[in-house]
């Protein structure tokens, strides 16, 4: 998508755009994506509603809200702004408390390489995790 609704090099613009997700469900994101047909939307509801699928909610937000192609690059999702996107579901317990539905993986750590890096502030872990946008 050429005309993004946010400036991909601006962390403030990304955050401000993400605020549009407040009080929205993942289903709402699909319903409001102007780039998919009703037929495709039905298939996507089924695909993203698979309880065995890990990471699919993050992919839904990446593709249908932020409109960028899903990738497995080790750099931050919004690399130009230095912002990493993390999406995680939660459940509401009987007493009303929130509980993480699954563990949240921040990044894959190469223990040998990151251990050898003497300056933590220059490590892959720090570069990837320094600024995160957490959506739940």
What are these regions (language model features)?
Residues 1-79, 84-136:
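Nucleic-acid endonuclease domains
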């Amino acid at each position: 998508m050429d005309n993004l609704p946010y400036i991909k090099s601006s962390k403030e613009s990304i955050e401000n755009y993400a605020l549009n997700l407040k009080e929205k469900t993942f289903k709402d994101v699909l319903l409001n994506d102007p780039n998919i047909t009703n037929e495709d939307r039905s298939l996507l509801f089924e695909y993203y509603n698979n309880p065995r699928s890990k990471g699919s909610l993050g992919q839904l937000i990446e593709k249908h809200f932020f409109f960028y192609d899903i990738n497995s690059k080790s750099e931050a999702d919004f690399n130009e702004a230095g912002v990493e996107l993390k999406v995680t579901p939660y459940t509401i317990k009987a007493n009303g408390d929130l509980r993480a539905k699954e563990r949240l993986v921040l990044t894959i750590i190469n223990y040998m390489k990151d251990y050898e890096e003497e300056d933590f502030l220059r490590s892959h872990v720090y570069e990837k995790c320094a600024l995160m946008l957490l959506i739940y």
